[in-house]
Amino acid sequence: MAKDWQDARLGQCHRLEDYSNVAINYTGPYLTPSGTMAYHPGNAPLFTQAPPHTNPQGPPPFPLFNSISPVYDPATGRLLYRNVNTQVSHTAIPNPANGYAAVYGGPPSQLPPPPQPQSHPNVTVISASPARAIEQQPTILSSTDSNIPRPGTVKSSASPFVPNQNPSAPPPPPQEYRQLNVTDALSYLDLVKLQFHQEPEIYNEFLDIMKEFKSQAIETPEVITRVSKLFAGYPNLIQGFNTFLPPGYSIEISSADPGSLAGIHITTPQGPLMINDLGKTTAPPPPHGSTTPLPAAASYTSMNMKQSSASHPVLQPPAPSTLQFNPSPSPAAPSYPPVDASVKQAADLDQAINFVNNVKNRFSHKPEAYNSFLDILKSYQHDQRPIQLVYFQVSQLFAEAPDLLEEFKRFLPDVSVNAPAETQDKSTVVPQESATATPKRSPSATPTSALPPIGKFAPPTTAKAQPAPEKRRGEPAVQTRNHSKRTRTATSSVEETTPRAFNVPIAQNKNPSELEFLEHARQYLANESKYNEFIKLLELYSQEVFDKNALVERCYVFFGSNEHLMNWLKDLVKYNPANPIPVPRPRVDLTQCKSCGPSYRLLPKIELLLPCSGRDDLCWTILNDAWVSFPTLASEDSGFIAHRKNQFEENLHKLEEERYEYDRHIGANMRFIELLQIHADKMLKMSEVEKANWTLPSNLGGKSVSIYHKVIKKVYGKEHAQQIIENLQKNPSVTIPIVLERLKKKDREWRSLQNHWNELWHDIEEKNFYRSLDHQGVSFKSVDKKSTTPKFLISELRNLAQQQKVELSEGKVTPSHQFLFSYKDPNIITDIARLFGVFLIHGSTHSAEDNEKMSNFLRSFLSLFFDVPYDSFIPYLPTHFNEEESDIDSLSSSLIEKPRASSSPIHHANNNGLRLLKDVLKKTYRGARENRSSVKEDYVSESTERTPDASEIDEHISEHEENDDESSSVFSTGEVWVNCKFTDTDGSLLDDGTKLSDRSVYNLFGNMSLYCFFRLFHTLYSRLEEIKNLEQMAYSKQHDVKSNPVAVELGLVRHPSERLGFALPTADTVYEQAIQLCERLMEGEIDQNGFEDALRCLYGIHAFRLYTVEKLVTSIIKQLHSVTTNRRLAQVFMYYEKDRVQRRTSPRQQIMYRIQTETAFGPDENLCCIDWNSQTRQSAIRLMGREDLTMGTLKSDAEKWCYYIGSYIMSSPTEGILPEHVRIPFLRKCLPSDEGNEDDESSSVVKSANAIITSFLESGLALTIPINTVKIRYENGTEDVFARNSEQVYNGPYDKIRDYRQSKWREWLNSDEGWTQGLSKDKVRRIKPCTIESLFNESTLRSGKAERFSENAGVESIGKKGKNLLNESGNGKKLDKGLPPKVNGKSSVTRGNKTNLKARNGRNNDDSSNKINLSEKEKEKESIEDEEKNREGSMSPVAKHASDVEDDHDVAKSTAPDFETSSHRPERSSEKKSPSPVFTSVKQTAENDADNEDDKTDMDDQTEETLDADNTMEEEPSKDDL
């Protein structure tokens, strides 16, 4: 590798062989290199900037280039070339101003003579002759100088600034191209890899580009563009890439800015390309409209195929046999055609492309003909069919277009010789120039054709067939029919990316000033689209479409602000300023002018006082000069958007176009007939000689030429029209009678067809006229479909509520509700019920039972809520929906059920609405009960299941129907935890929330289903109300507007029934007709389109509001079904019915009503309040949060204060206070701890044994809260008494509890703190062996009274201890007297006014049962003697007696039945004990308390008597003993 990068000290060696990798034969001075050069000593890349050098003397240096850029060492002044082992290397001649790297040479005397390339295969030869260099240069174009010609590129032969220039100029001498091999490609790849060794992604992207080109994914222009953008900033790589480009393509780099994309210019055969800063490749648009990418994609393909038949590694267009780099070089260098032949071929290709476009435009209405033409060309190119067969097929295809056939002959080789005899007679002679365009061929070769190429397949050039793969044969046709689908990918065709600015080649344009001007114009315009428009102007000028004055005038738009370019352009076109163009006046700033509406501005007076010679006094009076149109758009970027037409307007426009076309042709034909009739009358007066010499001008003696020519073309066709026109001009005496007769015949035919079409047009016009006026109908349906869904309605409610909260936090005043609806017309509510009834009968998909339930609910609920008489719903909402029952039976049953009318709507609703709501609630509860009972017991009949629930509801509702006292509250006043008085600032009492007052607002609390039902209901109500308000307008339209009598006489005015296909309903009002149409739609008598047309006949463009009435009713019924089948809502409606019938209410009642509703729904259901104001007939809807107040209409501070305190003293949570904001008012450490294991049975036994049975609560505390101090003040003499019921957790057998209590008692009694406390050992020893019989026997007591008197004190102390223990056990006292436990944040004890919640003991009221029976205790002691032998021996008789008394008392107390453990406890009494309920009345509780007190008193008295008797028998103990 080091050998390959040898360095050479130029000028020190005298022999050519001494330069192993460089040979110099140039004797002139050297050129200073510039830019970044790479130095590779020892294979280590180093990048440095070349120092400046000067050329002090000598002629201007001539630069020399190698095909691979040299590597320059600035320190030693050496230039290093890589040894690529090439035979011959030719270089291009760059512009010296570009400053590229040149070869450093020594003095001329030290340079060797030019070597021979054949003798040194490893030497790179650089020619010193400029002429020779020009002849030998390859396709690399590294110069931007316009003075140097660019062989290999196709440029115009005529200057765009000089019209009618002779294109026939002597071509330059032919060029020779060095055959590239695989070594050149690999060397370039190594250079790219070395340049980007630190950026491998760029090298990989370059390889991807080459792979895409090889796979035919992209084409040559795309490759050049992407490589230029990839190597931007590396001019040596871009210049080196020119070596591999096909002829006609080159990349040039501007010397001003070689490192940016703006300095890169790409030249293609189709025109120049520019790469802007954004990386987009732009090019001038095609001059003759848009052309298909098919011929453009093949233009360079055909050129390259004709220029070179051998394979060489240039960027050829992708083909199946073309590779990116061919590893096998050609054995010999190919021969290229001269430049004039290539230019001629390019011209022929342009003509072929234009011909294909003409064929496509001609057969635009017959695409199959155009596709057939392309198939013929493809078959010729692929299958190499004979040219005679091609011509025969094309002649049949173009039978109706002889002009295309004549033009097609120009592309055929020797048609007159090779065509069949029958075709030669019909064809004309091939033009001479087409024959000369075809080069001579050998007899064995296939004739080369100038047919337009299709896709990427060029016409066959050799006789040997080249079959393509099958998958490739169909590809060009698909691309042609689909207009090149590949343009949608990153690849685009040459015609689209590089549109031609000129149709003629520009290779012979040698005017450097023009090219320089175009370059400056491109840089000045910057915008590629503007530059393309400028090129179009130049092309039109070169074609003499307009003169130089018009060109200069139009170019002011592009270069008006650049005086230099305008003067340059005038010099190029030799503009004569004899008729100077007026300087454009500055435009008026209309934004500063006075406005009139959004679209007009008033011009200043200086703009109004302008002379005008063509106006008279009337024009100055009438015409507007002051106001100009200046619409104000929504945005400066957005232009004016025309009104979007609907499909019916489009139909009318098409109809008018067809009608206009008929009228235009008939009118023009009539004018031509009149003109020819005048000439025919004139001709009758002429002699034969005058007729023979008579001619007509081009306008045939009329005022216009185009009108008559169009009529001739319409009647005779375009192929014969010109001949007829010439005959009319040259021989009118013979032609006019024939043509006149033909025109009159056509006039009769066209008028007959017009009459036939008028009938069809009239029908189409009637069907589309009213629909075309309805611009809101289509959009209304789509919007209404989204806005009536439950999801949309619920989200709208929540968004409004959230927005109101935000506004309220900002201090803004917001209403308490989210929606406020008005129901002023009760008749519309009746009409809605009418539509509901029709839909339930004809359109409902629910069962008959559900329909009956919904109908009953609607009758009762609508009358109850909206204060509408119940009788008005009976004719429309049937009570039965059985299939066997007819409508007459249903109506009669409804009338039988009809009650007597009442004058008061509320009273009427109370009588009838309640019964219907009761029926609905019965069915709802019944259905839920049936579902539950069917799972539990299958054998229970259906009747037995329904009867109890229905009777319960009847019983529940009948209780409130009997209550007619308005002052009595339906709901409970609510339990309060404290008695409170509300006082004002002056000490007067305020309302505590229990005062009843008259009301006009009735609340209905519901969930989201009920909310959606009300929203949809009001939507239907509002639309019917809007339609009803249009009654006067619709009535005037039907009766006041009279039809035109002429139109009626001609049959142009038809009755709406004839157009609709059915008769409109007859009614007194138009609104009634609309309701009947809605009924007929739901009944299925008319379809949706007929329904809409009928509404348009009644209301015109305002009828769109009822287009979706059927879908809206369907949505309402769907929500109604979910409401009536919801069991929770059934209970809520029961609460609403109880509140609705009351004319007076209080805030506390409404709070309790809301609490009951929330309880019925549960905590997860969203709550909304729908209230009805009977005075204003308005309904408000508001979303109820947990923190929202029930009464949202409080105004004064006193009302708000009383409302808050009234909610505060209730046992329910205070309204307006969130639960998370409530602070617990006691310490958690004071709560009883539960350290034991709940699963441990012994722990449960302990808890149950220590449980307190009785509970007591007496609430008598009263307080006062003044409004001014907000401090609680308690009333004197009031208090609260509370005893709680402990938690009983054990439900096992009672024996375990008894045993546990006895063991604990005996353990304590025998301890030092028990009965032995304070006694001496002798006393204990004496008392311990005693028994109960010995102690309490009468004889023993009498005889031993004196002896034991001394021990009286000790026994008395023991007796007192036992009495105290018994009292403690009997009274149920316990050491732990903490607060009762909380259940779900609420106390387990409910407070009341002096209410004792003791549980009944269930014992017999007989006093004898409460006394201690010692004999029974002895028996019981003997029965358990075996179980407690050890403990029995250690206990004294007194201890045994005390323990037995305690056990008996505990048993008596614990046998009180409990709702959890009573079933497991044995009955200790001889009489039957019935368990008491959980909650008893005050009277029963008082009786039980009295019994319990008596029992306890008797037990205590008996114990005291026993102990007193014992004390009298014993002696009084001494103080020491005590």
Swiss-Prot record:
Annotated signal sequence range: none
Gene Ontology cellular component terms for the protein in this record: chromatin; nucleus; pericentric heterochromatin; Rpd3L complex; Rpd3L-Expanded complex; Sin3-type complex
Polar residues composition-biased segments: 426-441, 1385-1398, 1478-1487
Gene Ontology biological process terms, A to Z: cell division; negative regulation of transcription by RNA polymerase II; pericentric heterochromatin formation; transcription initiation-coupled chromatin remodeling
UniProt biased composition (Pro residues): 328-337
Residue span, PAH domain: 178-248, 345-415, 504-576
Biased composition range(s): Low complexity: 442-468
Entry's localization field: Nucleus
InterPro entries: HDAC_interact_dom, PAH, PAH_sf, Sin3-like, Sin3_C
Residue numbers bearing the Phosphoserine modification: 442, 1443
Phosphothreonine: modified positions: 446
Record keywords, A-Z: Activator, Cell cycle, Cell division, Nucleus, Phosphoprotein, Repeat, Repressor, Transcription, Transcription regulation
One function term, GO molecular function aspect: transcription corepressor activity
Pfam families linked: PAH, Sin3_corepress, Sin3a_C
Matching PROSITE patterns: PAH (PS51477)
Acidic residues: bias regions: 1488-1522
Function according to Swiss-Prot or TrEMBL: Has a role in modulating the nuclear import of TF1 virus-like particles. Essential for viability.
Protein name in the entry: Paired amphipathic helix protein pst1
Gene that this polypeptide is encoded by: pst1
